[in-house]
């Protein structure tokens, strides 16, 4: 009796294993079927898109009733048209770009605002991965900048509790090479927000009204992509003091400045758009640009003192391959009047001296030679007296 029973048990185990194996294969096949169904649907949608007729780009002028809108097509004429049921009609405000059906001219979908290629390029400027620890000797300036730019974007409720309006922007001013652009890059890389880097001289256009239009589009883009930081470098290119005499080119720059002033403090508020401006010549800027309400805080970034120079030198010398003890304090004592860029140049020159000596490392003597060489070239520079603004 035992043999048939054992045989039956063995058959049962065998069938059970086969069942598990088939069940596993069935699950795999179901996953494959799911994936293939997705691919099929995507291919079908792509095929429909290829076969479908194109659409006309238009602009909403006015809403007549709940279902009817006046739109202007790009080819000129105006039409009273309907709208797809699935669309949120509250978004169809005057000025909204929409796609119209070729035959019925029904509003099929809304389109994003048209962006100038220059503004689009500004938004794709990568600030890089810069941390505050990489900036030496500017702890007070970093604190002031973060209070104005970072705090209103990350903790706006603090300002609501106290009952004050958050600052709109700040001006970074000081001698060249002191880290103004680096500070702005650090703020942008530490915050999860959009960043527009604008070189002010690139805004100026030879055609009347084009520069002001670019400023408008830049601020419209920033408002559509909040939170956003606009960093305008070398603001003295368009923010110079206004005067009555001048050529037509000067008047065009003044019109650009007036558009900038209007966008910064006009009827249309900036909300979560923050401004950082940088310049080497604060004395040439227009008083209307500097007033509170536009640039609420002016941060002076002066030449670093001895302790700050020591911090900066250690940061720049960190990645360098060194041999033996390096006396940073002795190097810093010879670097009176140096800015951050000069101290980085000292490290580069020290590396060049090591390469010239056919070494794979830098020694103390290389740094001493480099700091003397940079000090000699500094004598050629002219100095500006930076008064507080």
UniProtKB/Swiss-Prot annotation:
Keywords: Acetylation, ATP-binding, Cytoplasm, Nucleotide-binding, Nucleus, Phosphoprotein, Proteasome. GO terms for cellular component: cytosol; cytosolic proteasome complex; extracellular exosome; inclusion body; membrane; nucleoplasm; nucleus; proteasome accessory complex. Transmembrane segments: none annotated. The modification N6-acetyllysine is found at residues 72, 206. Disulfide bonds: none annotated. The modification Phosphoserine is found at residue 244. Component of the 19S proteasome regulatory particle complex. The 26S proteasome consists of a 20S core particle (CP) and two 19S regulatory subunits (RP). The regulatory particle is made of a lid composed of 9 subunits, a base containing 6 ATPases including PSMC6 and few additional components. Interacts with PAAF1. One of its GO terms (molecular function) is ATP hydrolysis activity. This is 26S proteasome regulatory subunit 10B. InterPro entries: 26S_Proteasome_ATPase, AAA+_ATPase, AAA_lid_3, ATPase_AAA_core, ATPase_AAA_CS, NA-bd_OB-fold, P-loop_NTPase, Prot_ATP_ID_OB_2nd. ATP binds at residues 174-181. One of its GO terms (biological process) is positive regulation of inclusion body assembly. It comes from the Eukaryota. Belongs to the AAA ATPase family. It is found in: Cytoplasm; Nucleus. Its main location: cytoplasm. Component of the 26S proteasome, a multiprotein complex involved in the ATP-dependent degradation of ubiquitinated proteins. This complex plays a key role in the maintenance of protein homeostasis by removing misfolded or damaged proteins, which could impair cellular functions, and by removing proteins whose functions are no longer required. Therefore, the proteasome participates in numerous cellular processes, including cell cycle progression, apoptosis, or DNA damage repair. Pfam families: AAA, AAA_lid_3, Prot_ATP_ID_OB_C.
